[in-house]
UniProtKB/Swiss-Prot annotation:
Keywords in alphabetical order: ATP-binding, DNA damage, DNA repair, DNA-binding, Nucleotide-binding
Residue numbers binding ATP: 622-629
Keyword Transport assigned: no
Role noted for this protein: This protein is involved in the repair of mismatches in DNA. It is possible that it carries out the mismatch recognition step. This protein has a weak ATPase activity.
CDD domains according to UniProt: ABC_MutS1
Pfam families registered for this protein in UniProt: MutS_I, MutS_II, MutS_III, MutS_IV, MutS_V
GO CC annotation: cytosol
Protein name: DNA mismatch repair protein MutS
UniProt key word Nucleotidyltransferase: no
Family, per entry: Belongs to the DNA mismatch repair MutS family.
Gene3D superfamilies cross-referenced by the UniProt entry: 1.10.1420.10, 6.10.140.430, DNA repair protein MutS, domain I (3.40.1170.10), MutS, connector domain (3.30.420.110), P-loop containing nucleotide triphosphate hydrolases (3.40.50.300)
Biological process according to GO: mismatch repair
Single GO MF descriptor: damaged DNA binding
Length: 859
């Protein structure tokens, strides 16, 4: 039978269905674009297009249930106990899911069991531990656009971190999207910008982007009369975006959001600007293949807690310009390093767990018993951490951490008394609240647990009373308690025995006494479970009262974890403290690329970098594979590490104010946008030339290589000149165009350096050492030989190279390409320069004229 494809949408369509399906269709009509997981007994079922989509995405069986208009209704389902695994996969695919639970009792319901939507799971609003990456912020972002200005609001619901900002260019907008990498991005249906760097993009109706509504919603959320106290009233577009975000979160969570109690404006000038291209080229969070291995985060992340890991990535992604704050971080790292106690602090932090997200789940009332167990363990560690910090000479950063850690002795004792040592995963079946915590619960539990002895006594009593030696008293979940007698002795059953079940070899009965006992025991179990759930909710109420100090504690622990990790990394990787200056300088002694050094088996060759007011650009020449790109990247990474408060891989480093880091390294076709390699290269170069300043660090590698030699050389020359003379940015400019080295003779701030190499027996040996002056050879053929180019091809290339380097002009051969920017020799003019017309006869003059015409024709 053919499967129905679309869900019915009208009441007339509904009338053809069973009451249960009508209930489903009414709920589905409210969420037409989301997958509805509809609870039916031990399964969550999906129907119609939802079933087809889920079957494909989850690789589950597509079947059918009933009919609609003569067609079978498509159906797919997953077991309720395994639903988290399926939800995880859907969320990672960018899907949103509606969870519809049974809230009624099937045994007492007349008609369909009552059901309601209990939560909506979207990629940017999930809080369940199983659905989250513990190393990555799970951010919901909203963008509101008016003309060329953008308001941005972001919320990580798993921490309550609520931030807004305004941006005035698409380039800066895309840089922010690349930095934040939102799990879900909301934009207006009228928005002209279509950013692609988000796992899930949704368009919202324009009426959700209303400024007046946003003000009302935000004031209600923060329980204030105005937003003046938050210092954000000068950001109307961002406030509008925040209002849309809050509407969406309220829609999905269907619960209060007490952990979202503040909003903060991010100022662009507070941080180094790093565009999307530079983030990828420097491999800050992921490598060029999109994996974390061999990225800067991979190297640095030896944190003990998930929240510390996430904070470290935020620091890497947003280096600060405030040198005072950076010096405070650096001082804290120095203290932890000098006292050599980072290992002990690490061991204590390891027992904390993901306190930040546990607190958020408590606020959302979705915390599970093991969340409370982990919270109890974390609170138990705090006194030891306090003592460890007390033993240190505290600078401002460490003192703030100690103050915000807090001591929660009362909460710790409460959780110690209330929750058993190893609780089950969920509260649903009870067994979470410890004995002795609540007298009414203990009484109900005793009634249930002591039933076993009552049954033993009843069985012995009935055997003696009836003289039937096969009498047994038992229980099963379907029929409850019963008295069992063998079929052979069933005729001896007393008259007060009421037959309950007949099996092959036995008869089962119930008595009035046993029925009374059954009602009492079963009701005690259900009442005990209800009481336990009530006590659990009371615990959550108590914890929510301490929400703000618990959030402050989680933040303090994350900061301590990152600083402690930076101390360990500095010690292990031989990093040293950089020095900040208030004048223009980047002076690095024996700098190293931290990641390349870490993965190399051979010793890494350190190199110096010196840029200052009179030395703003280095033209870097040298062979391919000589280390030019590594050298440039290490300079940028050392700068960036200093600007997150870390020590750096160098013997010494002096760094002045830096506002931006740009890179133009490598390029590939952007076929999706119809852009060639050269177009991509020029677009990136244009962004740098439009946005770099005197305080920017610019890395330019092989500009102009994607076009003809003359075009490429001309562009590279002009770009380098513009950077050096107009922008006056700090620049490392790597090139194979040897003609660019001439800039150093005309521009005082430009210097030539090269990565050294030597040739031995037609083989190249890379020294990777930076030397002053230009390279004298490119060693292209030797590198090609290393790459495995056939020997015959190398020999042919060598012959051609000799011809090009030593051109011979003949009557039949065109002259070789002239050097750019040098005067071109003209044979006609050369001959004219040799003539003295006063010494020529008319015949000689005529002959020479014919020779000149011939030379001109050859030219």
């Amino acid at each position: 039978m053919e499967l129905q494809t679309k869900s019915p949408t009208t009441q007339n369509d509904f009338s053809q269905h069973t009451p249960m399906m009508r209930q489903y269709l009414r709920i589905k009509a409210e969420y037409p674009d989301l997958l509805v997981f509809y609870r039916m007994g031990d399964f969550y079922e999906l129907f119609y297009d939802d079933a087809k989509k889920a079957a494909k995405l989850l690789n589950i069986t597509l079947t059918a249930r009933g009919q609609s208009a003569g067609h079978a209704i498509p159906m797919a389902g997953v077991p309720y106990h395994a639903v988290e695994n399926y939800l995880t996969k859907l969320v990672r695919l960018g899907e949103s899911v509606v969870i519809c639970e049974q809230i009624g009792d099937p045994a007492t319901s007349k008609g369909p069991v009552a059901r309601e939507v209990t939560r909506i799971i979207t990629p940017g609003t999930v809080s369940d531990e199983a659905l989250l990456d513990e190393h990555r912020d799970n951010t919901l972002m909203v963008i509101h656009q008016e003309k060329d200005r953008f308001g941005i609001a972001t919320l990580d619901i798993t921490s309550g971190r609520f931030l807004i900002q305004e941006i005035i260019s698409e380039n800066a907008l895309f840089a922010e999207i690349e930095r934040i990498r939102p799990a879900e991005l909301l934009i207006s249906e009228e928005n002209s910008v279509h950013p692609l760097k988000a796992d899930s993009i949704k368009r919202r109706p324009p009426w959700e982007f209303d400024h007046a509504t946003a003000l009302t919603l935000l004031c209600q959320q923060f329980q204030t009369k105005s937003l003046d106290g938050f210092g954000i009233t000068h950001l109307p577009l961002a406030i509008t975006a925040a209002g849309c975000l809050l509407q969406y979160v309220n829609y999905t969570q269907k619960s209060a959001l007490p952990h979202i109690h503040s909003i903060q404006a991010e100022q662009n000038e507070e941080a180094l600007f790093i565009d999307a291209n530079t983030r990828r080229n420097l491999e800050l969070i992921t490598n060029l293949q999109g994996e974390e291995v061999h990225s800067l985060a991979w190297l640095l992340d030896h944190t003990a807690t998930p929240m510390g890991s996430r904070l470290l990535r935020r620091w890497i992604n947003r280096p600060l310009r405030d040198q005072i704050l950076l010096q405070q971080r650096q001082n804290a790292v120095s203290t932890l390093l000098e006292k050599r106690n980072y290992s002990e602090i690490y061991e204590n932090l390891r027992h904390i767990g993901d306190l930040e997200r546990i607190v958020a789940r408590i606020a959302l009332r979705s915390a599970r018993p093991r969340d409370l167990m982990q919270l109890r363990q974390a609170l138990g560690v705090l006194p030891t951490l306090h003592q460890q910090l007390t033993n240190l000479p505290l600078n401002k950063q460490l003192q703030e951490i100690k103050n915000n850690l807090g001591l929660f002795d009362e909460l710790f004792r409460l959780l110690k008394k209330a929750i058993i040592e190893n609780p089950p995963i969920v509260i649903r079946d009870g067994g979470v609240i410890a004995d002795g915590y609540d007298a009414p619960l203990d009484e109900l539990r005793n009634m249930s647990t002591n039933s076993h002895q009552f049954l033993i006594d009843l069985e012995q009593q009935e055997r003696e009373r009836t003289k039937i030696n096969t009498v047994k008293v038992g229980y099963n979940r379907i029929h409850g308690y019963y008295i069992e007698i063998s079929r052979a002795q069933a005729k001896q059953a007393p008259t007060e025995y009421i037959r309950r079940q007949t099996l092959k070899n036995v008869e089962r009965y119930i008595t009035p006494e046993l029925k009374i006992f059954e009602d009492k025991v079963l009701s005690s179990r259900s009442r005990a479970l209800a009481r336990e759930k009530e006590l659990y909710e009371q615990l959550l109420d108590t914890l929510i009262e301490k929400l703000i100090p618990l959030q402050q504690c989680a933040s303090a622990i994350a900061n301590l974890d990152v600083l402690n990790t930076l101390a360990e990394r500095a010690d292990t990787l031989n990093f040293n403290a950089p020095q900040f200056c208030d004048y223009p300088i980047i002076k690095i002694e024996a700098g190293r690329h931290p990641i390349v050094e870490n993965v190399m088996t051979d010793p890494f060759m350190p190199n110096d970098t010196h840029l200052d007011e009179k030395r703003r650009m280095l033209i870097i020449t040298g062979p391919n594979m000589g280390g030019k790109s590594t050298y440039m990247r290490q300079t940028a990474l050392i700068t960036l590490l200093a600007y997150i408060g870390s020590f750096v891989p160098a013997k010494n480093a002096q760094l002045g104010p830096i506002d931006r880091i740009f890179t133009r390294i490598g390029a590939a076709d952007d076929l999706a946008s119809g852009r060639s390699t050269f177009m991509v290269e020029m677009t990136e170069t244009a962004a740098i030339l439009h946005n770099a300043t005197e305080e920017s660090l610019v890395l330019m590698d092989e500009v102009g290589r994607g076009t003809s030699t003359f075009d490429g050389l001309s562009l590279a020359y002009a770009c380098a000149s513009y950077l050096a003379t107009k922008l006056k940015a700090f620049a490392l400019f790597a090139t194979h165009y040897f003609e660019l080295t001439a800039l150093a003779s005309t521009l005082q701030a430009v210097k030539n350096v090269h990565l050294d190499a030597v040739e031995h027996e037609e083989k190249i040996i890379f020294l990777h050492a930076l030397r002053e002056g230009p390279a004298n050879k490119s060693y292209g053929l030797q590198v090609a030989q290393l790459a495995g180019i056939p020997r015959s091809v190398i020999q042919h290339a060598r012959q051609k190279l000799e011809e090009l380097e030593n051109p011979v002009i003949s009557e039949t051969q065109q002259p070789q390409q002239n050097e750019l920017f040098l005067p071109i020799e003209n044979p006609v003019l050369t001959q004219l320069d040799k003539l003295n017309p006063d010494n020529l006869t008319p015949k000689q003059a005529l002959d020479i004229l014919y020779q000149l015409i011939q030379l001109r024709q050859q030219k």
